[in-house]
Curated annotation (Swiss-Prot):
Species: Danio rerio
Post-translational events: Among the many cysteines in the lumenal domain, most are probably involved in disulfide bonds.
Protein name: Divergent protein kinase domain 1A
Transmembrane segments: 28-48
Lumenal membrane side: 49-428
Topology of this chain in the membrane: Single-pass type II membrane protein
């Protein structure tokens, strides 16, 4: 009897163990299936995103087709389409219609930028522009004389930068760029390429600030595809995480993480001084004032010597063009009157239209965007004075023209404070 009881107990335990083992197997099988499903979904989404955003082959095919038909011409055309000396590298695109790739052109490292669209919007920004479109490479038309093309360029630039005493000099600069083979003549294909490029803020800025150290040099173009020199370190700060991880990290923690991966403080101070110098260059510059409407870290980078470079100038817009576009913008509240990331005006509620004057100058928005970057790691004896000056800078209101003396005083005080601190250090 005892033996029977023992057998039944042993069988019961064996059955219980087998049932538990089956449950564990099913559980792990389900978890394995779930992991495979999630991984496959992530890979699919990443691949779909990549194929949607990264269309370099399509861009090259369109440009080279136009070049082979004699519609466009430019200094980069033969290297891109005939000699295969201009190579597309890593995709950096964030929007399907604005292709950005690292590139190699002979012994030069560059960044290739190409607009993928059947129609090209005048570039103040699609969200602000009236519905004004041109078919790409339609202008100038066959039979247009060089003198007529010059008038077209002058009229367009006047609308962008306003009436300038030296507008003719800017027109001459544009025509010099248009003459890509430097033979002293502008062909119709060269003129079509130049006209398409002239609609882009970044190209206009590159011409206006050519020779200045804080904007990448324009290396060449073909149609509306253009190549600028590559900036070694970009974005200015922060880390790039896979988007599933990025979704789960709180915004405050993300900002702190971004500040962990930055150069030493003297080098950060030198980079910030470069930003102040860039603001000086575009405030009452040779060809008018410009507004920097995206002060995020992704818009900037720096060289191996820690000199600041503007890496994305699409949201740097001539102040005159900004004003003209804003007064055409309808609004219901102040939030409707924003261009780019941070250029704001107010809403005239009685007229339901945005006002023309920007709420804060470039300097105030730069100080606000870079405050945490600059204060983190600052020498203890400097922190109080630096913070005080940064907050005074952030308090600037209205356009720089309205408070020119205060603007210049704050900018020079910040530069002096930082240079005095880092001028004797090897890091700077």
């Amino acid at each position: 009897m005892a033996r029977g009881l023992f057998s039944r107990a042993w069988l019961s335990k064996t059955h219980h163990f087998q049932a538990r083992l089956s449950y564990i197997r099913v559980k792990y099988l389900f978890l394995t299936w779930l992991a495979v499903f999630v991984s496959s979904w992530v890979v699919y989404v990443q691949y779909s995103t990549y194929t949607e955003l990264c269309r370099g082959r399509e861009c090259k095919s369109i440009i080279c087709d136009k070049y082979s038909k004699g519609i466009i011409d430019g200094s980069a055309c033969s290297s891109l389409c005939e000699e295969s000396k201009l190579y597309f590298g890593r995709c950096l695109s964030t929007k399907p219609n604005n292709q950005v790739y690292t590139g190699s052109w002979g012994d030069q490292d560059g960044v290739i930028k190409c607009q993928l669209s059947d129609v090209l919007h005048y570039e103040l920004g699609e969200e602000l522009e009236p519905k004004k479109e041109i078919t790409l490479f339609e202008k100038p038309t066959r039979g247009t004389s060089v003198e007529k093309f010059k008038e077209m360029v002058a009229s367009h630039l006047k609308a962008k930068v306003g009436e300038q005493a030296n507008l003719s000099n800017l027109v001459s600069l544009i025509l010099s760029v248009a003459d890509s083979n430097k033979d002293g003549h502008i062909s119709l294909p060269e003129a079509k390429s130049a006209w398409a490029l002239l609609q882009l803020n970044e190209v206009l800025l590159a011409v206006v600030l050519q020779g200045r150290e804080h904007t990448p040099k324009l290396l060449g173009f073909c149609g509306d595809l253009y190549v600028v020199e590559r900036v070694p370190h970009a974005p200015l700060f922060g880390i790039t995480l896979p988007w599933p991880m990025d979704l789960w990290i709180p915004a405050g923690m993300r900002r702190s993480m971004d500040q962990w991966f930055t150069p030493s403080w003297p080098r950060k101070a030198k980079i910030f001084i470069g930003l102040l110098e860039l603001i000086e260059d575009i405030f009452h510059g040779t060809f008018g004032s410009f507004l920097m409407c995206d002060m995020r870290a992704s818009s900037f980078g720096y060289t191996d010597r820690h000199d600041l470079r503007l890496v994305d100038g699409r949201r740097v817009v001539a102040e005159e063009a900004f004003k003209q576009a804003m007064i055409l913008q309808r609004c219901k509240d102040h939030e409707d009157c924003v261009y780019g990331a941070d250029c704001r005006t107010s809403c005239d509620l009685s007229e339901q239209r945005c006002t023309a004057e920007v709420a804060q100058p470039n300097l105030a928005r730069a100080c606000g965007a870079m405050k945490d970057y600059l204060l983190r790691g600052a020498p203890f004896h400097l922190q109080e004075e630096l913070e005080k000056q940064l907050y005074a800078c952030m308090a600037l209101k209205g356009s720089a023209e309205q408070m020119e003396m205060e603007h210049s005083l704050i900018l020079n005080n910040l530069k002096t404070l930082l240079w005095k601190q880092i001028s004797h250090t090897t890091d700077s």
